[in-house]
């Protein structure tokens, strides 16, 4: 039986295609096998660009976070420092798993397992730093916060932080979530978070994710923060408060911008609070700048990944980075953030002693402000 010329050419093309795929697989295997991850192989500048922290700070953070990641369903043996670096790199840039193979010397499936296992361990232990209002820690720093905000030109003298909602754009979800996630204000599909940011640049409280169509006041009610602040912000018999925009309803512990027809004094109050209140917007920008993958909607897909957990992890990483290198918010208010030991100890009940006096200035070896490692020139990788 003879073969036609077209059939013969098809067989030749299939053979060459298979040969090319084998060559690519062999080259990929050799490229990965030649790489062994070590922080010592990175300069300080490269480490800041890739992982957002200096090498010795990463090692110290892994120790302070007590990061031990088990892999019971696989035979992976991964150092905790490498696990943490996988999380940092994945959040720092919207890169693909394939792009990270040469950096870590591991195949994409292994990197995916390491990332999600480390993220689960990290957030299970340390997410309460964001979800709980640490009363003792924040009470001891309340005097410092209110003083720094007043010195920045604010009209209100007992304000200890600023509250606002932020919208994280996501890829268009499938059926069942499109209406819930669609924000008529932004005209995009999104999820929402509520943040309370203090003048040292830290995210003191983070609630979410929530449907993108919800109002800021709805998030405030659902967060349960109202009941907590009613007692927590009465400090030594003096009522303190946080400040938000006109979307919030006024309470003794929550002040908001005046709206409607205003007197000259009310207009002056709004004007003096306008710039300090923008500190909360700087915090939203800082999180997305340090964790650039959170600003790439094509990779944030509902039902295909824990999108809300990614943002919460980014907020925690930002807080840790702020403690070491400071932020634009801390520079504006001249309010140094606490050290890592004090910040992490506040969750363990150890941050009470010297929380206000234990504030540290920015590390001499670190960058200044939020933008020090925010721009690494990464190109947005494909999904």
Language-model features, listed with the residues they occupy:
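Short alpha-helical segments in extracytoplasmic peptidoglycan/chitin-binding modules
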Residues: 54, 86, 100
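Short, amphipathic alpha-helical "recognition" segments used to contact nucleic acids or chromatin
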Residues: 80-93
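Short, well-ordered secondary-structure "scaffold" segments embedded in the functional core
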Residues: 96-383
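Amphipathic, well-ordered alpha-helical segments in soluble domains
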Residues: 57-64, 89, 96, 114, ...
